[in-house]
Amino acid sequence: RSGRGECRRQCLRRHEGQPWETQECMRRCRRRG
């Protein structure tokens, strides 16, 4: 459970093809921890 690089990797894979959604996902992940 890293949370730093894993969050960005999961967001990029979960929102592949949606840069705007990936940025929001990373922002939410950073706020959660």
Swiss-Prot record:
Cellular component terms per the entry's GO annotation: extracellular region
Subcellular location: Secreted
Classification lineage: Eukaryota, Viridiplantae, Streptophyta, Embryophyta, Tracheophyta
Tissue expression pattern: Predominantly in the embryo portion of the kernel.
Keywords: Antibiotic, Antimicrobial, Fungicide, Plant defense, Secreted
Coiled-coil regions, chain positions: none
Pfam families, per the entry: Antimicrobial21
Source organism (scientific name): Zea mays (Maize)
Name this protein carries in UniProt: Antimicrobial peptide MBP-1
Predominant subcellular localization, coarse grouping: secreted
Database matches in InterPro entries: Plant_Antimicrobial (IPR029227)
GO biological process: defense response to bacterium; defense response to fungus; killing of cells of another organism
Function: Inhibitor of both bacterial and fungal growth in vitro.
